[in-house]
Amino acid sequence: SVAKKLLDSGLKVVMLESGGMVPESEYQQLSKGENSGPSFLSLDASRLRCFGGASGLWAGVCAPFKSDDFDKKSFIPLSGWPISIDDLKVYYIEAAEMLGISYEKFYNKRFFQDTLNGLSFKQFDRKNSFLTGNVFQISNSKNKDFSVKYKNEFESSQNIDVLFHSTVTQLNLNTEGSEVESVSIADLLGNKATVKANQFVLACGALENPRILLASNKYY
C-alpha cells in the first residue's frame, strides 16, 4: 500500500519483497512462529510472503479501531496509546478507498438502522466489559488481491523497482544509533546484499516489523 501511494511520485523507490510474485512454500516457512494463548491460525498460514501480501488471503472484512481502543483500561495491562483515533482518520479514509469500502458508513447510524429493517442494536459498555460491539463492512471490490489488482501499475511504473526474494535481515544503524544507513537482505540460496537509501520505510506488518527491529541489535 505504501509503494502504491508512491507510484509516479517522482521519487526513486525500491520495494524489498521477502517472497516472490506468488506464494512459495519455502519462503512461507520464514513466517513460522509460536502462538501463545487462545488457539488460532498458525503464523505462516495466516500471512503471505509475496507481492500483495496478505491481501491474497483477504475475504474483504473491514473494521476500524474505535476511539476507546486507544484508552487505558484497568483490566488490560499496559493499555493506552499516545495517539487517538483522530490522528488516524485521514489515513483510514484513504485506506477505505483503496479497499473498496466507505469509511463514513462505519459511523452512519442511519445507514445501518435502515439496513436492519426496523431492528435496533445497542453498543456494549466497553469501558467495564470484555464484551464489545463492532460494525464490519465487507469490500465489494471486484479484485481483493492486490498482487493482481495493482500488478500492471507496478510493471509500468517508471520510478519503482521491486526486488523479489529479498528478506531484510537487519537494519544497519550509524554508530550513534540515530539513523538507518542501510539494510541487509538475503535469499534462501545464501546470497546476501546491502541496500542503501536516503529514507527507509518499515512496512512489514505487526509481527515482522518488531522481528526485524529485534534482530537489528548490532549497537543497541
Regions of interest found by a model, annotated:
Residues 3-5, 27-28, 48, 213-215:
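Short amphipathic alpha-helical segments
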Residues 24-27, 54, 60, 69-70, ...:
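Short, solvent-exposed loop/turn and secondary-structure capping segments
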Residues 32-106:
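Redox-cofactor-proximal catalytic regions of oxidoreductases
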Residues 74-77, 81-180:
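Conserved redox-cofactor binding core of oxidoreductases
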